[in-house]
Curated annotation (Swiss-Prot):
Its cofactor is Mg(2+); Mn(2+). Its EC number is 3.1.3.16. Mn(2+) 2 binds at residues 62, 230, 279. Binds 2 magnesium or manganese ions per subunit. This is Protein phosphatase 2C homolog 3. Gene3D superfamilies: PPM-type phosphatase domain. It comes from Schizosaccharomyces pombe (strain 972 / ATCC 24843). It catalyses: O-phospho-L-seryl-[protein] + H2O = L-seryl-[protein] + phosphate; O-phospho-L-threonyl-[protein] + H2O = L-threonyl-[protein] + phosphate. Mn(2+) 1 binds at residues 62-63. The keyword Secreted does not apply. Residues 350-363, 401-414 have a biased composition (Basic and acidic residues). One of its GO terms (biological process) is signal transduction. GO terms for molecular function: MAP kinase serine/threonine phosphatase activity; metal ion binding; protein serine/threonine phosphatase activity.
């Protein structure tokens, strides 16, 4: 879990911004860790000669072994990408891949990093016209909220994944207790040069900086994107986060405040249990305006929720303050009542609406905050009706059996 403080640092560092295409809110919090090793980037309107409209860039970097690589990436990766020839040609997939590798090499060649053991994840989103390009290396995560459904734009890179494990072993490493060489809990990162061999190609390293890139064409169903480090995803599923954010939007809360509330609901009340909720936390929420202004975008989502168009966390989640919240008047920590419900589930990928009916058997219990929301009922109503009809028949038969047993018991008593 790493070293922790006796009391968490719950001060938030929040920013926001907008243009005609996106609105974003971003917040970070040190939490229980002895230092803050996360970093982020939010650049509106990057210039690209290949497209008419400006390009928007968002990224979250989760550092480990120190903060130097993460902070360097937060300051330099956007510029490396913008200067990349492939970026200026409009080849955004290859531009993202080569920019991650170029950043890795630039750090390696920098004298100030020669004795630095740190590394960082990177999850990046580019908005280019009506497309999203998501590049990811590590176990930070980017998720799209599409009418309340979590759609993964990235996949966590864990050493236990068979493809990742095969690369690690082929490069001379091993996986022990779910960690690279028994040490690192993720299998791709920028930095971490103790795991890199100058005789191997960048994509074949034990720990590679090469990202996976997902391209998504934005549809009218798509509402917002959430980028966050694993300090969030270890505590909430992708589906829970999307529903939490959606409820905050319905309540008219600013995106940076929703991010703050989410972190407060993830942070642990103490460090005595599993270690979940004790990490640094960073959350970036990006609204996809799609020709709406801010107020129209908020109203569109509120109208959808009012019409029961997709799952949303219950109304009380817009006001819930978790263990990390402090009063704005005196910075006094609020004592959380014993019956406060703080979800502590291991993160899981979201599921898109094209999934088959067996993709998630009971999302309302394991991955959803929406009261009464059932995956099958929402997307496979005919199947749900058949199951409900069968269940009702079972209940009727069960009630009949109970009644018969009662009659027999009365007769026996007489």
């Amino acid at each position: 879990m790493g070293q922790t403080l006796s009391e968490p640092v719950t001060e938030k560092h929040s920013v926001n911004g907008s243009n005609e295409f996106v609105l974003y809110g971003l917040s970070s919090m040190q939490g229980w860790r002895i230092s803050m090793e996360d970093a982020h980037s939010a650049i509106l309107s990057m210039e690209c000669s290949a497209v008419k409209d400006p390009v928007d860039f968002f990224a979250v970097y989760d550092g480990h072994g120190g903060d130097k690589v993460a902070k360097w990436c937060g300051s330099n990766l956007p510029q490396i990408l913008e200067k990349n020839p492939d970026f200026q040609k409009g080849d955004f997939v290859n531009a993202l891949k080569s920019s991650f590798l170029n950043a890795d090499k630039a750090i390696l060649d920098d004298d100030q990093f020669h004795t630095d053991p740190s590394g960082c994840t990177a999850t990046v989103v580019l908005r280019v016209g009506n497309k999203l390009y998501c590049a990811n290396a590590g176990d930070s995560r980017t998720v799209l909220g599409s009418k309340g459904i979590a759609k993964p734009l990235s996949a966590d890179h864990k050493p236990s994944n068979e493809a990742e494990k095969a690369r690690i072993c082929a490069a001379g490493g091993f996986v022990d207790f779910g960690r690279v060489n028994g040490n690192l809990a993720l299998s791709r990162a920028i930095g971490d040069f103790e795991f890199k061999n100058s005789n191997l190609e960048p994509e074949k390293q034990i720990v590679t900086a090469l990202p996976d890139v997902v391209v998504h064409e934005i549809t009218d169903d798509d509402e917002f994107v959430v980028l966050a480090c694993d300090g969030i995803w270890d505590c909430k599923t992708s589906q829970q986060v999307i529903e939490f954010v959606r409820r905050g939007i319905v309540a008219g809360t600013s995106l940076e405040k929703i991010a703050e509330n989410l972190m407060d609901n993830c942070i642990a009340s103490d460090t005595e249990t599993t270690g979940l909720g004790c990490d640094n936390m960073t959350v970036c929420i990006v609204a996809l305006l799609q020709e709406n202004d801010k107020s129209a975008w908020y109203k569109k989502i509120a109208d959808r929720v009012a019409a029961n168009d997709g799952p949303c966390a219950p109304p009380e989640y817009a006001e819930n303050h978790g263990p990390g919240w402090r009063s704005g008047d005196n910075n006094k920590k609020v004592i959380v009542p014993p019956n406060f419900h703080q979800v502590k589930l291991n993160g899981s990928d979201g599921y898109d609406k094209d999934a088959n009916e067996n993709s998630k058997e009971d999302d309302s219990t394991n991955g959803s905050l929406a009261a009464g929301f059932r995956w099958k009922e929402h997307f496979f109503p005919h199947k749900a009706e058949e199951e409900n009809s069968s269940s009702e028949t079972d209940i009727v038969n069960s009630n009949k059996d109970v009644a018969d047993d009662h009659k027999e018991a009365v007769s026996a008593a007489d």
